[in-house]
Design a protein with these regions (language model features):
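Oxyanion-hole/transition-state-stabilizing segment in secreted/luminal serine hydrolases
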Residues: 1-29, 60, 152, 156-163, ...
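A short helix->loop->beta-strand "cap" motif at the edges of active sites that frequently abuts
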Residues: 40-51, 92
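Beta-propeller domains with acidic blade repeats across secreted/periplasmic ectodomains
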Residues: 210-502
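Conserved catalytic region of serine esterases and O-acyltransferases that act on ester linkages
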Residues: 47, 105, 109-226
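Generic structural signal for well-ordered alpha-helices
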Residues: 32-37, 80
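Structural recognition of the beta-strand scaffold that forms the well-ordered cores
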Residues: 7-13, 51-56, 93-96, 112, ...
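Extracytoplasmic/secreted cell-surface and envelope-processing proteins
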Residues: 18-23, 62-65, 103-105, 363
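Substrate-gating cap/lid alpha-helix
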Residues: 60-97
């Protein structure tokens, strides 16, 4: 606020707070008054305190299997009235967007607005502030605002903040992460100038000049670079158990789209799906994410892929994915998204942001380990350094410094459990009794418990002590493995050496 010399603050409250119940109204009003008093005393623009306009929550809508309106609107109405009372007594602005009409189907989950819902919200907000109807939208102006917001969001809610403002800021990130943030600020300002030019009639089209954005400094590999080898030469260096054979199913040499693979998964047709990210560790100024999910097929049964299809190519660091509901659930920090091919052409053409607000302070610790539980819920987790705050129709979910999540697609209910400090979240599976076992590089332990009150955590678990980094595991129950290995456990190590162990 100080950096932007803020004159006016639009402050939206009431939705998350409402889940505390109407008995918390006195506390809510007291905290709201305290916020107003403190904010008024800060001259962010260097002259005087900002004007404050409170914005009520929007009404919830009932959807199939998600009775959000029935669950929440009575409480939301009470909290909206409380906000109006505080605004009147403090003599500040207030806009009631709760009691305004919204078309059916204005939300993605009964709670969060879609494009049509935001159009209705924008109209209600404009009328509430200026007491008149807005002019027809200038589409070019709207697109300019969207473009600015995209660049501003990358500065306001960036990935990997633990490396330039958090605990590792003195060791990593300061050479390129901080200059990148500065460049995003410059790019957002450049787009702001284009917005004003269109709004004032000086320009009719978006015209952006980024010539003032400096080049990022060159960086070095502090640990030294890897020695790149062909798949054939790499295979020659493998030490292989004599009971097994290993062949290269697909290589980047033959299929360039599978550069930087993160996760693989086989489908019911015997095709290998691969999530790849060249965007990692995050988007840099002037770039756009173009990560992929690629399908590899062996069409002639020779044990090698001979066909490659890019199923989705505009993803943002897809650390994990899982099939479901005729499509694919994907991790795209801070979002949890759903993709689907609706016309059968072999490429995703439908995309929905199911949930958002997941932590991204360390981008390779974000949502990972997607797997269906035996009772039909989608299980996943995040890891240390992250702070997740997710709004749902059933109330906010908060996790600090790692936690597990369970998601029910039918009702879109999200739960969290078993919060304890754990590191890189790479490896989860179920035994034949339905117990889930998870690994992480430092402790390689498993722990099950309901959550203590946020933000406290359980102590670190005592389990199988780790000996190195781990990045995958599975119980052996495949006929292709030797009989004496059935019922055993396979684990993958990634440091100090790459090994698959039994």
């Amino acid at each position: 606020l100080l950096h932007h010399k803020t004159d006016i603050i639009f402050a939206a409250f009431g939705f998350n707070e409402s889940f505390a119940g109407k008995e918390k109204i006195p506390e809510f009003k007291s905290r709201l008054r305290k916020y107003i008093t403190q904010t008024r005393t800060r001259a962010y623009n260097g002259k005087k305190g900002p004007k404050i306009i409170l914005i009520s929550p929007t009404p919830n809508q009932n959807l199939d299997n998600i009775p959000a309106a029935d669950l929440n609107n009575e409480r939301l109405a009470i909290f909206t009235s409380a906000m109006r009372e505080v605004a009147e007594s403090e003599e500040i602005g207030f806009v009631d967007v709760f009691s305004k009409p919204y078309p059916d189907g204005s939300t993605i989950n009964g709670v969060h607005l879609n494009e049509e819902g935001y159009r209705a919200f924008g109209t209600a907000l404009f009328k509430g502030i200026f007491n008149e109807s807005p002019e027809p939208v200038n589409e070019e102006l709207r697109l300019a605002v969207v473009e600015k917001n995209k660049q501003f969001f990358r500065r306001y809610r960036p990935l990997n903040t633990f490396y330039y403002t958090g605990g590792r800021k003195g060791r990593y990130g300061y050479l390129d992460f901080l200059p990148a943030m500065k460049n995003f600020e410059i790019m957002a300002n450049n787009r702001d100038q284009s917005i004003w030019s269109i709004a004032k009639g000086k320009e009719t089209k978006i015209k952006i000049d980024d010539s003032n954005v400096p080049e990022l400094p060159e960086t070095n590999q502090s640990r030294g670079g890897n020695k790149w080898m062909s798949a054939e030469d790499e295979l020659k260096l493998f030490t292989i158990d004599p009971r097994f054979e290993v062949n290269c199913f697909a290589s980047e040499e033959d299929f360039p789209d599978i550069a930087c693979p993160i996760q693989i998964r086989w489908d019911s047709k015997g095709r290998l799906w691969v999530a790849c990210s060249t965007t990692y560790p995050h988007v840099y100024p002037g770039q756009e994410p173009n990560d992929k999910i690629v399908i590899l097929e062996d069409t002639n049964g020779d044990g090698k892929a001979d066909k490659s299809t890019v199923w989705a190519d505009d993803l943002h660091i897809p650390l994990s994915f899982e099939f479901g509901n005729g499509g694919v659930y994907v991790s795209e920090e801070p979002d949890f998204t759903f993709l689907k091919d609706t016309d059968g052409d072999g490429k995703a053409d439908f995309r929905s942001r199911v949930l958002t607000g997941f932590g991204c302070e360390d981008s390779h610790h974000a949502l990972h380990d997607f797997v269906w539980t035996p009772d039909g819920k989608l299980l996943f987790r995040d890891s240390i350094f992250l702070n997740s705050q997710i709004e749902t129709p059933y109330g906010p979910i908060r996790v600090k410094n790692s936690g597990w999540f369970l998601f029910e697609p039918k009702t879109q209910r999200l739960q969290t459990f078993g919060s304890y400090p754990n590191t890189n979240p790479w490896g989860v599976t179920f035994d034949k009794w339905g117990h889930h076992v998870a690994s992480h590089p430092i402790f390689a332990s498993t722990f099950h418990a309901t959550n203590p009150p946020y933000p406290t955590q359980h102590p670190r678990p005592s389990g199988i002590q780790a000996y190195s980094g781990t990045c995958g595991q599975e119980f052996v129950d495949w006929d292709t493995f030797p009989k004496e290995m059935q019922g055993g456990f396979v684990k993958v190590r990634y440091k100090p050496t790459n090994r698959v162990e039994f």
